[in-house]
Amino acid sequence: MTETADLWPQLLGQLLDRQSLSEAQAEQLMNGWLQNQVPDVVSGAILAALQAKGVSAGELAGMARVLQRASLGSPLDLSLLVDTCGTGGDGAGTFNISTAVAFVVSAAGIPVVKHGNRSASGKVGSADVLEALGVNLGAEPERVRAAVAEVGITFLFAPQWHPAMRAVIPYRRALKVRTIFNLLGPLVNPLYPNRQVIGVYAQELVPVMAEALRLLGREGAIVLHSREGLDEAGLDQPTDLGILSGGLVRTEVLNPADYELTLAPTQALKGGDVAENAAILTQVLQGSGTPAQQDVVALNAALALQVAGVAPDWRAGIAQAREILARGAAWDRLQQLVHFLKA
């Protein structure tokens, strides 16, 4: 017990010296948090020190492994499984772009396990808007899991699948600033997707998150941040990408001006309250949103389609996503999920 008690101040000292934790140390720390072994004062100091130092890929990977193992899920027996969960936290108040993307990708025939929560950034999280559109957030876990095979998409409401994380809620609420937990959500999907698109709230996180995904064994991923400040690919400025493919991470820049898209400022992508965002999502998935709304979803869906291996390049992915949106197939997929989770 003394040995464990001595460990936490040791880890804090290491972080204050601006030395990153190893993956093993990060696992120890997360286990300590979940088992309520770390004193509150030390926990707060560790979270602040991590944030001040800058989170490393190894710290993210180590903590994510523990949280995934502690979740109520387990891997699905599928060779291809995609998630489009981002970090949120960009503060831009856009409509739920990555949520719309999930239904486009599913309508393309790719199994999707969308992991999400209530709002972390602007006004409306994926769980908020999907609940407003009729998705049962309280469906039984086995029903949620079965939706992947039966519908082609499911939604995992994070608090239902991560009961162990209740242990860390007091630290997060007390600090009222961003912590490593804001980054862990997209990495701990309980159904273990092997391919992901993750938007992050800061450019410097792109290579860090991409490397964390590599350490966690993902087969393919794109991590992105738009220079407009979005955790999505926008229609005004280039987007920085960290691409994980073949076990290697490379960086690229995606310029919307190169792809015959509707170029538009962030203002054109704004959402509102839950009802407004639900209305926008309905229009977009039915193919009747504004040109900017339709195209920002098509662009971000193209990234996911390429990660999934069904689009040879972004241009082809954009065309495929536009066609899916135009015929209302993504809306049909949402209605199928609503019906299945209510049964």
Curated annotation (Swiss-Prot):
Q: Which reaction does it catalyse?
A: N-(5-phospho-beta-D-ribosyl)anthranilate + diphosphate = 5-phospho-alpha-D-ribose 1-diphosphate + anthranilate
Q: Write out the residues that bind Mg(2+) 2.
A: 231-232
Q: Which domain of life is it from?
A: Bacteria
Similarity comment: Belongs to the anthranilate phosphoribosyltransferase family.
Q: Name one GO molecular function term.
A: magnesium ion binding
**How cofactor binds (record note)?**
Binds 2 magnesium ions per monomer.
Species name for this entry?
Answer: Synechococcus sp. (strain JA-2-3B'a(2-13)) (Cyanobacteria bacterium Yellowstone B-Prime)
Q: Where does anthranilate 1 bind?
A: 86, 117
User: Any idea of its EC number?
Assistant: 2.4.2.18
Q: Which cofactor does it need?
A: Mg(2+)
Query: Where is Mg(2+) 1 annotated to bind?
Result: 98, 232
> What's the top EC group for this one?
transferase
Q: Which GO terms describe its cellular component?
A: cytosol
Q: Which UniProt keywords apply?
A: Amino-acid biosynthesis, Aromatic amino acid biosynthesis, Glycosyltransferase, Magnesium, Metal-binding, Transferase, Tryptophan biosynthesis
Quaternary assembly = Homodimer.
So where does 5-phospho-alpha-D-ribose 1-diphosphate get bound?
86, 89-90, 94, 96-99, 114-122, 126
Please name the GO terms of the biological process aspect recorded for this protein, alphabetically: L-tryptophan biosynthetic process
Q: What is this protein called?
A: Anthranilate phosphoribosyltransferase
Q: Where does anthranilate 2 bind?
A: 172
State its role: Catalyzes the transfer of the phosphoribosyl group of 5-phosphorylribose-1-pyrophosphate (PRPP) to anthranilate to yield N-(5'-phosphoribosyl)-anthranilate (PRA).
User: Pathway of this protein?
Assistant: Amino-acid biosynthesis; L-tryptophan biosynthesis; L-tryptophan from chorismate: step 2/5
